[in-house]
């Protein structure tokens, strides 16, 4: 276990994509990324990011759910995106903050949550643990 000083905070976050009841994590290879993108093409899906912060014996957790609409993707769009390698390490096989932004006509929720760290909610967690989010010791 990680040892923290009394004034230190451990922060962690992870993101996954849900299409109905199916969870699309980080694809293990190009073929799986292709499968994920083909499934998401033309559909709405949820992006779920969970953030946790721990200070001493206090643990605070926040789940942020956003809805994302992906346009219908052509074979060429998928192949070009896969060739870019941008899908690697990304839940659902795409990153909204990169070239795949052009695939997303609409979102409802937290853009930074979709990217992988919902900033507003993270600041709220840190503030609730009396961590100086703006550089002030007074919070």
Set out the residue ranges of the language-model regions.
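Anionic-ligand binding patches
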Residues: 1-139
């Amino acid at each position: 276990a990680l040892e923290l000083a009394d004034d230190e905070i451990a922060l962690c976050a992870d993101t996954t994509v849900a299409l109905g009841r199916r969870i699309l994590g980080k694809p293990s290879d190009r073929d799986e990324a292709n499968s994920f993108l083909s499934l998401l093409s033309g559909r709405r899906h949820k992006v779920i990011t969970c953030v946790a912060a721990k200070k001493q014996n206090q643990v605070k957790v926040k789940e942020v759910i956003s809805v994302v609409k992906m346009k219908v993707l052509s074979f060429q769009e998928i192949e070009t995106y896969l060739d870019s390698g941008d899908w690697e390490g990304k839940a659902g096989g795409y990153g909204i903050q990169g070239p795949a932004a052009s695939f997303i006509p609409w979102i409802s929720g937290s853009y930074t949550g979709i990217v992988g760290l919902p900033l507003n909610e993270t600041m709220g967690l840190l503030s609730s643990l009396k961590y100086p989010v703006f550089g002030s010791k007074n919070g």
